[in-house]
Amino acid sequence: MKYAFETLSEDDFEKLVVKICQSLMGIGIHSFSKGRDGGRDGYFEGAAQKYPSTQTPWQGKFIIQAKHTTNVMASCADNEFFSNKTSVINKEIDRLKGVASQYPFDCYLMFTNRPLSGVVHPKIKKHLEKELNISYADIIGQEDLERYVDDCSELITQFHLLKYMLPDRFYEQDIRDVIVLFSQQNDDWLNKKEENEDSDDNSLTYADKVEKNRLNN
């Protein structure tokens, strides 16, 4: 099920991430707090209960981050999020290197409500592990967020996510396709009419505004 996470406030998104992490790792996770460097990090120390799995859980000191966006068109493949030197991820890497110099950590996990494709995911994961010099780093995108919420019905209630459930969206190209389809269908009917004047006339007809108003009334 799709949820409009972009409509949540930044604080509520962070609280949602904490609840998910409590399910994945344990209740010992510390909520997001603002450090001296301006970053907002969540913390956990120990062995995760079931991340990435119960058979091979991560363990050690964790730093967890939530990166929220209100832009429905944003994705993890955007240059401003990953590729650029000043991208969101590269800025965080620079900041976290400073954190690690004083408070070393073993695992890093970023949550975002941006869509995360199978193409860019391994690139970001590898980049984080290399630049942070740790063995365990990953990013969780919109798709996995939706799966975690689906598995935890209490999150749907607590964060009122049903009212944010996305309806089907129609775009300009969809409307154009429908218009073209009706136009082609009408042309077919008109051609059949010309071939057989005695047939029933089921074609679409056009009327000027005056005649249209008379027919509608």
Task: Identify the residue ranges that each predicted region occupies.
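Mixed-charge (Asp/Glu-Lys/Arg
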Residues: M1-N217
